[in-house]
Swiss-Prot record:
Family: Belongs to the ElaB/YgaM/YqjD family.
Keywords: Cell inner membrane, Cell membrane, Membrane, Transmembrane, Transmembrane helix
Superkingdom as given in the UniProt entry: Bacteria
Organism: Escherichia coli (strain K12)
Name of the protein: Uncharacterized protein YqjD
Gene name in the database record: yqjD
């Protein structure tokens, strides 16, 4: 799952949920109890679906993070001096940036 796909998926889920909740709020004053219960059950169902899908997306992101960490670990184990050099370079850059403040 690519980063762009994940971001778009999250946006679509949140928009769907907010649209459903907006419908509930905007129509609550003019509907009967039966209609309100239908709208409420629709909102609850949308919330459950969004939680499930967002949970799946979170799991996919966690898996991608584990894979990236494993690749970085493997690279550093195969090229330890390169890893030390990268760490030192990052330290120098951060030191310079922090010393300017």
């Amino acid at each position: 799952m690519s980063k762009e796909h994940t971001t778009e998926h999250l946006r679509a889920e949140l928009k769907s949920l907010s649209d459903t909740l907006e419908e509930v709020l905007s129509s609550s004053g003019e509907k009967s109890k039966e209609e309100l219960s239908k709208i409420r059950s629709k909102a609850e169902q949308a919330l459950k679906q969004s939680r499930y899908r967002l949970g799946e997306t979170g799991d996919a992101i966690a898996k991608q993070t584990r894979v990236a960490a494993a690749r970085a670990d493997e690279y550093v184990r195969e090229n330890p001096w390169t890893g030390v050099g990268i760490g030192a370079a990052i330290g120098v850059v951060l030191g310079v940036l922090l010393s300017r403040r």
